[in-house]
Amino acid sequence: LEELIEIDNLDNKLIQNFCYALSKIYFDIDKIEPGFKLLKKAKTAYTALNNYSISEEKNHFIKVKQYFLSNKFPKSDFNNTFKKIPIFIIGMPRSGTSLIEQIVSTHSKVYGAGELTILPKIIHNSIWDKNTNPQELLNFVREEYLSKISKLNTNKEFIIDKMPFNFFYVGFILNSIPEAKIIHMHRNPMAICWSNYKANFFDNIGMDYAHKLETIGEFYVIYNETMKFWNEIYPNSLIEVDYDNFVMDYVSGSKSIIEDLGLNWEDKVLKFHENNRAVETNSLLQVRYQVYQNSSKNWKKYEKYLTPVIEILKNNNIKF
């Protein structure tokens, strides 16, 4: 691999893949400096092939915020009912959403559907940012989501939708699907940012921000501001779970989540690592084994290389 990445005029896609693979080898044997250099080279190769600007996410949050500040959402009595109740798990990628989905989906009444793109597509296909009547919008979102989720191949009563980026749409969920549950995952901000940077997100939709430390920091700020906004206008509406506290006592944490969801406790929930449902995220190893602790401290080994994201978090008063 070391010889391959030195070949002149090597395709950027190959540079990306070779450098990433080699960086992981170096990190595994604690050779941090060469590992980080190769990781950065892999990320640079990716950004050379992809034109990305964080401004789209910033503008998206501004539009959502303005819409909810300028409209009133009366409580609605909907004619249609959900036979399969959605459980949304939201938060930053790498905040523990996959682990919680694996645990909760081990319950006999819950089906883990993974990262569904249903809700973002519905919102994007609506005209909520063009002075849409709020009631019409709520009906549209509800009907469309109900239609899509009813087609999932399961008879279980609860469906987990683990699309992390649904944090943008908390207000839409609360008003159009009031029977839904929303679990919001927290984790140490630097642990999240470092984990986003070092993860292999090259082929993941929506993860273009994760290939530069600066855009990771800026995206985290957007996420933080978005959740702060939802908590201000809809206080105490979410099931809040701190990943670091959860892994210290996942037995009590699991029981608390199951209770908050209104489900009866089942001991098999604690055997989540035996749940052989398909997992298609970077968290595969985490959900296949017992919970491990202290992973949120790993970023400190790489701290001197993470200055750009550290400065962004500090400048926005985000503690870590």
What are the functions of these language-model segments?
Residues E2-K13, F18-P86, T132, N139-N153, ...:
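PAPS-dependent sulfotransferases, especially Golgi type II membrane carbohydrate sulfotransferases
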Residues N79-N175, M185:
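Phosphate-binding active sites in nucleotide-utilizing proteins
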Residues G112, I182, L238-E240:
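Conserved beta-strand scaffold positions in the cores of enzyme catalytic domains, especially
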Residues T117-I118, R187-I192, F246-M248:
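Conserved nucleotide-binding/hydrolysis micro-motifs of P-loop NTPases
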Residues P164-F165, N245-D249:
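Acidic, metal-coordinating catalytic cores used for nucleic-acid/nucleotide bond scission
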Residues F168-G171, W194, V251:
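Short N-terminal helix/helix-N-cap motif within the alpha/beta-hydrolase-1
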Residues I173-Y197:
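Conserved phosphate-donor/acceptor-positioning beta-strand/loop module used by diverse small-molecule
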